[in-house]
């Protein structure tokens, strides 16, 4: 089952599998990052969007359209509509090349009596890095490629910082992409990254770079994975305490 199928299956279970005593509210937003500019894909209006830090420490895009959705069909309809507004262009290697990064977000709120649970699912489609010598990009295509490559490089810097075992500064603010994904790369997040590669020999150098990036991503530990070393250390400490208590008991018996 591909990632897209898993995504729609999970949404179907979300809408149809909830208990009868749960009130569900789901809101969808969709934007692209084009030449370091945030563009709302759920409306034809072009207003300036900025990432702002909220009072709870999370980040949000002010002015971004959010659509309430109550079914999988509504989600699909908005996604298809938003996709038609995404920036595409042609170059020597691709007639319909994505010229932007896309972020589709679903904010979910579940209410049961006095309990409220909230969560967010971000689906991110990154534009591929481009070697200008192969794409033959000029003019607008050249500017777009430079912006894409710069933001992907910033994402690589963030991944490198997160992969380090010692705490260090993580350069989230180096691009709109990484700043917007800061919450998705936090300690509480669960992240799945899929890297697309080409089987063609002509693309071997790009494939090697993509695999190297995937290997760095594999070294990043977030959420439960990050907590594992602490849990293991706690277990060792408890075992040591039990061993010391047993030793004290034996010494006490010998003293009698």
Indicate residue ranges for each PLM-predicted region.
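Canonical SH2 domain fold
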Residues: 193-197, 209-210
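Long, amphipathic alpha-helical segments that form or neighbor coiled-coils/leucine zippers used
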Residues: 203-210, 214-245
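P-loop NTPase "switch/coupling" elements that transmit nucleotide state to mechanical/effector output
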Residues: 4-189, 196-199, 228-254
């Amino acid at each position: 089952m591909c990632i897209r199928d898993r995504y729609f299956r999970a949404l179907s279970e979300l809408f149809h599998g909830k208990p009868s005593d749960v009130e569900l509210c789901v809101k969808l937003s969709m934007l692209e990052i084009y030449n370091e500019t945030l563009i709302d894909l759920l409306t034809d209006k072009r207003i300036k969007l900025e990432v702002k830090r909220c009072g709870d420490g999370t980040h949000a895009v002010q002015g971004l359209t959010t659509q309430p959705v109550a079914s999988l069909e509504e989600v699909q309809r908005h996604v298809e509509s938003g996709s038609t507004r995404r920036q595409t262009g042609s170059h020597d290697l691709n007639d319909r090349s994505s010229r932007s990064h896309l972020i589709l977000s679903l904010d979910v709120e579940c209410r049961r009596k006095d309990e409220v649970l909230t969560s967010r699912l971000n689906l991110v489609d990154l534009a591929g890095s481009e070697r200008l010598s192969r794409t033959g990009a000029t003019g607008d295509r050249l500017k777009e490629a430079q912006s894409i490559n710069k933001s992907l490089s910033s994402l690589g810097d963030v991944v490198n910082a997160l992969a380090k075992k010692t705490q260090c500064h993580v350069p989230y603010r180096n691009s709109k992409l990484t700043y917007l994904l800061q919450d998705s790369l936090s300690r509480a997040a669960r992240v799945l990254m899929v890297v697309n590669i080409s089987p063609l020999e002509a693309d071997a150098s790009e494939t090697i770079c993509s695999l190297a990036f995937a290997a760095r991503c594999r070294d990043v530990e977030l959420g439960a994975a990050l907590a594992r070393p602490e849990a293991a250390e706690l277990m060792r400490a408890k075992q040591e305490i039990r061993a010391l208590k047993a030793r004290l008991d034996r010494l006490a018996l010998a003293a009698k």
